[in-house]
Swiss-Prot record:
Source species: Haemophilus influenzae (strain ATCC 51907 / DSM 11121 / KW20 / Rd)
EC number: 2.4.2.9
Pfam families named among the record's database cross-references: Pribosyltran
Name of the protein: Bifunctional protein PyrR
Short sequence motif PRPP-binding: positions: 100-112
């Protein structure tokens, strides 16, 4: 069973709202960089970057972050001798003394974010890391909390939350899949 909880229009309104929140929280955007976790987090980061630029005329430096080898669940990912493929980060971005806006699609256990923070250290020591999550579904296993949340969606552990993006899925929407 599938239930659409965010449609295309609401998806883009959520991007706009989060962009406004980022701008409002910072007196200046000069030391901000935006980093999206591949794949859907990176596409959401790109949407946020474009919207922030539309609103402020400032183009935030950005990159896509591949956390493949920083994950602590590689043995779970490695099914039937299929090793995960590291595609690399889109570019090198020096984050030394910058405020990093880290973006991902769904916050669940917190393990992906922990892996992303580990991966970020390869790019310098950030002054601060702020977290943007499009959907927070709860069930944390690590003490991770988002600074900006598109939507809080209480779920059961059996349900799956899918954030669908144009490049990956051909549309912008969020669905819950369950029994």
């Amino acid at each position: 069973m599938e239930k659409i909880i965010i449609d295309h229009d609401r998806f883009l309104r959520t991007i706009s709202r989060i962009s406004h929140e980022i701008i409002e929280k910072h007196q200046t955007l000069d030391d901000l960089v935006i980093v999206g976790i591949k794949r859907r987090g990176a596409e959401i980061a790109e949407l946020l970057q474009r919207r922030v630029e539309e609103l402020s005329s400032i183009n935030l430096p950005s990159m896509e972050l591949d956390i493949t080898f920083y994950r602590d669940d590689l043995t779970l990912v490695d099914q039937e001798d299929k090793m995960p493929v590291y595609s690399g980060s889109s570019q090198y971005l020096n984050i030394q003394d910058k405020t990093v806006i880290l973006v991902d699609d769904v916050l669940f256990t917190g393990r992906t974010i922990r892996a992303a923070m580990d991966a970020l250290t390869d790019f310098g020591r950030a002054a601060k890391i702020e977290l943007v999550i499009f959907v927070d579904r709860g069930h944390r296993e690590l003490p991770i909390r988002a600074d900006y949340v598109g939507k809080n969606v209480p779920t059961s552990r059996d349900e799956l939350v899918q954030v669908r993006t144009e490049k990956q899925d051909g549309c912008y929407e969020v669905a819950i899949l369950g029994k």
